[in-house]
Amino acid sequence: MSSPPSPERLLPPNLEQLPLPEEDWTSARALLRARQRIQVRRFAGPARYTEQLSHLRIAHLTDIHVGRVTPWAIQLAAVELTNEEKPDLVLLTGDFVCHSQRYLDRLEELVRRFDAPVMAVLGNHDYWSGADEVRMALQRGGVEVLSNAHTTIGLRHQMLQVVGLDDAYTGHARREDAVKGLRRDLPTIAMSHIAEEADGLWAHDVPFVLSGHTHAGQVTLAGLHELAIGKLAGHRYVHGLYGSRRHGEGAEPGAVYVGAGIGASVMPIRLGDRGQREIAIFELGYEPGAIEEHHEEQPALPGRPPTELQKQKRAAAVVEKRMRRELKASKTR
């Protein structure tokens, strides 16, 4: 299967081959500004893990895109913020570079800065840039890269299975290989750069999938992300938490989280509330909403009704949208 054309080919030739600007992206001021541009979102659950785990903290980052398009300070700040959360495990769901091998040493330096164990899968940009080279850079930085495989890691005296599905966008995902030999008696979490692969993983009793690729639209003004990523690109899962349909009698519902990512591609900008750079922290083993400081940002997980706070926020959003529409209509009269 041939790989789809890279969107980076729309850029001027060899943009990613140019050296980075001379500005000191590691200065205290640059890092402070970068930290302010990254949102840390926190979630508790899914509920299924409460019977299998005694409290683990997982950090999820995606689409780091080390290279010229994303400032180095942004990536340093992302690692710094992640370490401050003191996760038990860091999971990275692909697109580490941006159509170039020029910055692989910098990628190695970056992932080496994580304090916790790190596991990863590759994305489409990694294949367009040279999957073997990207994989080796990650491994030199201490990252365990899963390619259609799963592994078991001991954390806080308990075992967690991690499934890593290779990139589906470039045709490298082999789900059957990834789940072969999974133990049903152990809690399992999966990584896939493309969120739509979660449908097949749920069917194999993998309850929770982390993914990326969409950048949450990257530019989310006036609903452009829903048009570009959803309708035009054909993605059912654009950003945030989505639940599965049940697969047969007695099957447990699953969930997939689509991260907004850290870096950018094609354009060096991210605009709109939903397009902000993001780190997601998951507290496994807790009931959703059980941790007070997580309650506001906790979406309704599959099989659970929305909280009163969520209902109020949704109602307020509907009213705000209607008022904006009415205001716009009044100006055109």
What are these regions (language model features)?
Residues I38, P46-A59, V143-E144, H150-V163, ...:
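Beta-strand-turn-beta hairpins that frame and shape the catalytic cleft
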Residues R140, A195-A280, G289:
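Conserved beta-sheet core of the metallophosphoesterase superfamily
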Residues A59-T62, L89-D95, P117-N124, L146-A149, ...:
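Active-site neighborhood of phospho(di)ester-bond hydrolases with catalytic His/Asp-centered motifs
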Residues M136-V143, A149, L155-G200, H204, ...:
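Binuclear metal-dependent hydrolase catalytic cores centered on His/Asp/Glu-rich metal-binding motifs
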Residues G67-G154:
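Core catalytic region of metal-dependent phosphoesterases/phosphodiesterases
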Residues S27-A34, L61-I74, V97-R102, D126-G130, ...:
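Acidic/histidine-rich helix-loop elements
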Residues F96-C98, N124-W128, T151-I153, D167-T170, ...:
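Solvent-exposed loop/turn segments at secondary-structure junctions
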Residues M1-R57, R68, K313-R333:
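Acidic, histidine-bearing metal-coordination/catalytic regions of metal-dependent phosphoesterases
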